[in-house]
């Protein structure tokens, strides 16, 4: 195991894509009490790295048996714990309990931890959470409780919460009011749950002002129509979506990135993409599209389009670029069309007149 001081120093800013938890230290502390201000950084870019010198050391001798404690970080991962340990210092800000055998969160498990900023419970066996288990956590901003046995979203989440990762559980329903009062929530990762479209009650996301939402690897057959309209990123990859209809994207006009790869999409209704004027990146790879979706030339800010591994047989000269010069505000820097039955030698060079570099175009490698 790496020494805690070194792990702390390597804590880096997490990527918006793919938002996959690989370990306790693979998540952000941006805007947290330990984050170095941009003004303090000089030389190399360390704006997302935890600065150990900026952390006020704790002088408490409290540290649960078998755990590693340094500054205000308590690391109790991979210990075979059956319950949340006692003797946790009240000034703890990061608590790592991942990779244990915890099955229940009880009422007083986090009593006195009013300064806790991040709680990691990934890869346990949690199936039951007391309705007041999180009540003491008045400053909690990041809750990672993925890869457990939850069948419902925990009740009474702290109003301070900014990021919730609850993917890879057994959740089938998102009831109305479950996110009530979470005005600070910015990001929810809830993929890998057996969620169907009918599992989202009308108004389930009311009051949320999310920027990021991922519901990948679920059982969706269409794009949910009642998600927060504030979204900048929406990832619905690895579902069973078969078509995009005109009204599906109507309320998501603020999207920068839309992920719909690895679905069963055969049809995108004309005009559907016109509701996404700020879109920068579109993932439609590994679907069943027979042609390039219409409307791409009208997306003035679009820079990346993934269309590989579809059934596209033809690429028209105006499929990607507008007809007039100066219309597109941002040129493409990535278009993937490989693994499609397109005779790429027949595609006219002018087709990619609004691409920054021909190396950004990926063609060929079609396998029947």
Curated annotation (Swiss-Prot):
Effect of residue 303 to P: In MRLS; uncertain significance
Tissue expression pattern: Detected in placenta (at protein level). Found in several connective tissues, especially in articular cartilages.
Keyword match Coiled coil: no
GO process terms (BP): articular cartilage development; blood vessel remodeling; bone development
Disulphide-bridged cysteine pairs: 63-69, 67-76, 321-354
Gene Ontology molecular function terms on file: cytokine binding; extracellular matrix binding; extracellular matrix structural constituent; extracellular matrix structural constituent conferring compression resistance; glycosaminoglycan binding
SUPFAM superfamilies with a match to the protein in the record: L domain-like
Effect of residue 266 to T: In a breast cancer sample; somatic mutation
Cellular localisation: Secreted, Extracellular space, Extracellular matrix
Signal peptide (UniProt feature, chain positions): 1-16
Gene Ontology CC terms: cell surface; collagen-containing extracellular matrix; extracellular exosome; extracellular matrix; extracellular region; extracellular space; Golgi lumen; lysosomal lumen
Pfam families noted in UniProt: LRR_8 (PF13855), LRRNT (PF01462)
Gene3D superfamilies, per the entry: Ribonuclease Inhibitor
InterPro entries: Leu-rich_rpt, Leu-rich_rpt_typical-subtyp, LRR_dom_sf, LRRNT, SLRP, SLRP_I_decor/aspor/byglycan
Residues modified by glycosylation: 42, 47, 180, 198, 270, 311
Modification after translation: The two attached glycosaminoglycan chains can be either chondroitin sulfate or dermatan sulfate.
Key words, A-Z: Aortic aneurysm, Disease variant, Disulfide bond, Dwarfism, Extracellular matrix, Glycoprotein, Leucine-rich repeat, Proteoglycan, Repeat, Secreted, Signal
Residue positions assigned to the propeptide: 17-37
Ranges: LRR repeats: 82-102, 103-126, 127-150, 151-171, 172-195, 196-220, 221-241, 242-265, 266-289, 290-312, 313-342, 343-368
UniProt main location, coarse: secreted
Family (UniProt): Belongs to the small leucine-rich proteoglycan (SLRP) family. SLRP class I subfamily.
Function: May be involved in collagen fiber assembly.
Binding partners and assembly: Homodimer. Forms a ternary complex with MFAP2 and ELN.
Entry's disease: Meester-Loeys syndrome: An X-linked, thoracic aortic aneurysm syndrome characterized by early-onset, severe aortic aneurysm and dissection. Other recurrent findings include hypertelorism, pectus deformity, joint hypermobility, contractures, and mild skeletal dysplasia.
Record protein name field: Biglycan
Annotated source species: Homo sapiens
């Amino acid at each position: 195991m790496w020494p805690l001081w070194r792990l702390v120093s390597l804590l880096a800013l997490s990527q918006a894509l793919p938002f996959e938890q690989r370990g306790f230290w693979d998540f952000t502390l941006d805007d947290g009490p330990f984050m170095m201000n941009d003004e303090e950084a000089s030389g190399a870019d360390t704006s997302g790295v935890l600065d150990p010198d900026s952390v006020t050391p704790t002088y408490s001798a409290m540290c649960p048996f078998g755990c590693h404690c340094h500054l205000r970080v308590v690391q109790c991962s991979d210990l075979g714990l059956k319950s949340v340990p006692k003797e946790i210092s009240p000034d703890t800000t990061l608590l790592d309990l991942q990779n244990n055998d915890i099955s229940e969160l009880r009422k007083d498990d986090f009593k006195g931890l009013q300064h806790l900023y991040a709680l990691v419970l990934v890869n346990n066996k949690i199936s039951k959470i007391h309705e007041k288990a999180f009540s003491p956590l008045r400053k909690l901003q990041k809750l990672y409780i993925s890869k457990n046995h939850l069948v419902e979203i925990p009740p009474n989440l702290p109003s301070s919460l900014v990021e919730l990762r609850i993917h890879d559980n057994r959740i089938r329903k998102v009831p109305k009011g479950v996110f009530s009062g979470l005005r600070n929530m910015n990001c929810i990762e809830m993929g890998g749950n057996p969620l169907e479209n009918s599992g989202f009650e009308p108004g389930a996301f009311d009051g949320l002002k999310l920027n990021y939402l991922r519901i990948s690897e679920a059982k969706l057959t269409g794009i949910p129509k009642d998600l927060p309209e504030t979204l900048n990123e929406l990832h619905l990859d690895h579902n069973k979506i078969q078509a995009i209809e005109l009204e599906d994207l109507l309320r998501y006009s603020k999207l920068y990135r839309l992920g719909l790869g690895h679905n069963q999409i055969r049809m995108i209704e004309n005009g559907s993409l016109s509701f996404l004027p700020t879109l920068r990146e579109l993932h439609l790879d590994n679907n069943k599209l027979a042609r390039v979706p219409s409307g791409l030339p009208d997306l003035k800010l679009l820079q990346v389009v993934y269309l590989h591994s579809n059934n596209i047989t033809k690429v028209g000269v105006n499929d990607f670029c507008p007809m007039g010069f100066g219309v597109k505000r941002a040129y493409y820097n990535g278009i993937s069309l490989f693994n499609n039955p397109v005779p790429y030698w027949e595609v006219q060079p002018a087709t990619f007149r609004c691409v920054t570099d021909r190396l950004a175009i990926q063609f060929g490698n079609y396998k029947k």
